[in-house]
Amino acid sequence: MRWVLPDHIQDALPAEADKIERLRRRLLDAFRSHGYQLVVPPLLEYLDSLTTGAGQDLKLRTFKLVDQLSGRTMGVRADMTPQVARIDAHLLNRRGVSRLCYCGSVLHTLPSTLTATREPLQLGAELYGHAGLDADIEIIRLLAEVMRLAEVPASRIDLGHVGLFRVLAARAGMVPGREEELFDLLQAKDLPDLHALVAGVAEPVRSALLALPGLYGGAEVLDKARVCLPDDAEIREALDDLSRLAAALGDLPVSFDLADLRGYHYHSGVVFAAYGGGSPAALALGGRYDRVGEAFGRGRPATGFSLDLRELAVRLADVGQPGAILAPAGGDAALEALVAQLRSRGEVVMTELPGHDGSWNEAGCDRQLIRREGRWTVESLQGE
């Protein structure tokens, strides 16, 4: 069956494709109005460039192939964030703040969930060159605006900080392999296996690691964290950052999840996840990743977010736009002038082709151009 697509790969048919494109234009225009400049990275690069500074998860999600010109291993991008970091660090080479945005397909070897596509249409925004919380606040507010424009207002924005995990893992003496296991258990909030893994860790770090999965909810979480986490300068700084963010974003539905560590391999500070539209999974993910550019010769403070445009477009309401107008074929100058005028006003006008016996309603036409008393007029098109 030559028409069958691989699992978790889908076509976008006209109705869905129209939603995706309308939403893409709307969101990129919003980025532009905030000063974010569009970049278009290539679909594939040398593998070491695509996965530099990333964790094992990104490497496993990346399709690999051999470049027939150089013989080097290439990868099809699974995430555009490292590509944009490369552009900022190596190509633009700006000294001040740089605001960049992007939209393009990425490809995953495996779906992230049972129902997820393996070809998300990734859209995102990144802010480089400012280490202060003002940059994080700008990015989170931009994300909230994007979700509002997509007609899926954020019902919850969870904030976390990977610095908490890094400090506790270091103080627990976790080697890289065990740290990965600890990360997985915290993400899954698997308390029985977490108890077993940290059984030999000294106090107070052991109790702190066991407390992390329960540190989620409202502002009271930060007060609780100050009590049950060690009195460490880096931990205090991370909690202070989260407190200041919560105060600055008081008009948004902000909550906290201190065990949410997605992307911790390259994130370096505040992380966040946005939920909405009744989805149990996060619709957008983001955070600070100050060290990613180091692999490209220029480490810069950076923060940003990304989302799957397809996932948002599914939730976009039908706008009830008028259908197309059917125009008869022919060389009538008045007709051609009217067709051009209608198209300039945003109307869709299809020209009838000789011998076509299909349904014009099926093709999207609900009106037609009819000549009445020497003048062309737009009238309702009756179904065939």
Curated annotation (Swiss-Prot):
Keywords: Amino-acid biosynthesis, Cytoplasm, Histidine biosynthesis
Record's subcellular location: Cytoplasm
Keyword Cytoplasm appears in the UniProt entry: yes
GO biological process, any: L-histidine biosynthetic process
Keyword set includes Cytoplasm: yes
A Pfam family matched in the record: tRNA-synt_His
InterPro entries: aa-tRNA-synth_II/BPL/LPL, HisRS-like_core, HisZ
Pathway assignment: Amino-acid biosynthesis; L-histidine biosynthesis; L-histidine from 5-phospho-alpha-D-ribose 1-diphosphate: step 1/9
SUPFAM superfamilies found in the cross-reference section: Class II aaRS and biotin synthetases
Superkingdom of the source species: Bacteria
GO CC aspect terms: cytoplasm
Entry-linked HAMAP family: HisZ
Additional notes on this entry: This function is generally fulfilled by the C-terminal part of HisG, which is missing in some bacteria such as this one.
Function text: Required for the first step of histidine biosynthesis. May allow the feedback regulation of ATP phosphoribosyltransferase activity by histidine.
Similarity remark: Belongs to the class-II aminoacyl-tRNA synthetase family. HisZ subfamily.
Quaternary structure and partners: Heteromultimer composed of HisG and HisZ subunits.
Name the UniProt record assigns to this protein: ATP phosphoribosyltransferase regulatory subunit
